[in-house]
Design a protein with these regions (language model features):
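ATP/NTP phosphate-donor binding region
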Residues: 1-63, 70, 74, 315
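Short amphipathic alpha-helical segments
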Residues: 17-19, 73-76, 103-105, 219-220
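Catalytic core of DAGKc-family lipid kinases
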Residues: 30, 77-204
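Glycine-rich phosphate/pyrophosphate-binding beta-alpha loops
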Residues: 151, 155, 207-221, 289
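Short acidic/glycine-rich loop or secondary-structure boundary segments that cap or lie
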Residues: 155-158, 200-202, 213-217, 241-245
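A generic structural signal for short beta-strands and their flanking turns/coil linkers
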Residues: 186-188, 202-204, 227-232, 271-273
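ATP/nucleoside-binding phosphotransfer catalytic cores, i.e., glycine-rich phosphate-binding loops
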Residues: 194-195, 225-226, 235-315
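Active-site loop ensemble at the mouth of alpha/beta enzyme cores that anchors a bound cofactor
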Residues: 220-228
Length: 315
């Protein structure tokens, strides 16, 4: 079959287009038969992947970063669910700044190395998270699938602030957004229900993880495993700005000492979660804002669902 490569020319801080030739050269050197298209706007990757599946291309290869992977993955899943068939295999090529999904799956993060994995044709399935949320009216619903994590509260709040700081780039932009977000000290009262318990009370953040690493350096769900058939939900209430600033560096630790060890932070294993928040909260999935304001959110696990081209011992 012919592979469809969906390349995001804006990936890696607008350097994706410069790497098109390297991608094509690597794939040709490995004897891959492929057709390459480029995204032209946000969410275009989802439409291109959906049409590629409908037109019989396989595998579907996303060349970009985590936002690109998420768009393409959602197009694959939508096509599979519409036709009630197995999802088409997904291949990953690293053109982004962080490429968290590839790091989480222990895949090579150079173009030639990743191309060799795709050409080898070995498949392993991972779990996917599903998030369903409603707008404030409760009438309009949005469903999204994620491979890394999704969150409400402080995490997407910082993402929104970062998007509005258009005059800065790189890590200093995220640092400033974080400081502004913490200074505002946002808090939410939530009702959180899951298979095995519930919680009603204040929170600073809620994150639901399928993989441990997100945002390049943050382990928001440090014990999440994309092969275990469950999601990791982490919630916590940290009331003061000083305490938040003390806890935040611990989100960058992958092992002992991570923020989930803080007494105000709780980590649970779930197959589903339902959340109601007051006031409304922003919501992101794999780093992309889905709602700037929502109050009702549901999470579900799709175990052993998405086939990804990787070595059999990639875990």
């Amino acid at each position: 079959m012919t592979a469809k490569i969906i390349l995001n020319p804006y990936a890696g801080r607008w350097k994706g287009l410069q790497k098109r030739g390297e991608v094509e050269e690597a794939m040709k050197s490995l004897g891959m038969d492929f057709d390459l298209v480029m995204t032209e706007s946000p969410h275009h990757g989802t439409d291109l992947a959906y049409q590629a599946v409908k037109n019989g291309f396989s595998p579907i290869i996303s060349a970009g970063g985590d936002g690109s992977y998420s768009e393409v993955m959602n197009g694959i899943v939508l096509a599979a669910q519409e036709s009630q068939t197995e999802p088409t295999p997904l291949g990953l090529l690293p053109l982004g700044t962080a490429n968290d999904l590839m790091v989480n799956l222990h895949l090579p993060t150079d173009i030639l190395g990743a191309s060799k994995v795709i050409a080898a044709g070995q498949i392993r399935r991972i779990d996917l998270g599903e998030v369903i949320a409603w707008d404030i009216s409760g009438k309009n619903q949005k469903k999204r699938y994620f491979a890394n994590n999704s969150a409400i509260g402080l995490e997407p709040n910082v993402t929104l602030i970062q998007q509005r700081i258009s005059w800065l780039r790189g890590s200093i932009r995220y640092l400033l957004a974080t400081l502004i977000g913490v200074a505002k000290n946002p808090q939410w009262k939530i009702h959180l229900e899951w298979d095995g318990g519930d919680y009603t009370g204040p929170v600073t953040l809620v994150t639901v993880g399928n993989n441990p690493l997100t945002g390049g350096v943050f382990y928001m769900a440090p014990h999440a495993d994309p092969y275990d058939g469950i999601l990791d939900c982490v919630y916590g209430f940290i009331p003061s700005r000083i305490q938040i600033l003390q806890v935040l560096p611990r989100t960058m630790k992958s092992g002992a000492g991570n923020y989930v060890d803080h007494p105000s932070v709780h980590e649970i294993k779930v197959s589903w979660v339902k959340i109601h928040t007051d006031p409304p909260t922003p919501l992101h999935a794999d780093g992309e804002i889905q709602f700037e304001s929502t109050q009702d959110i549901e999470y579900h696990i799709l175990p052993d669902y998405l086939p990804i081209l990787m070595y059999g011992d990639a875990k």
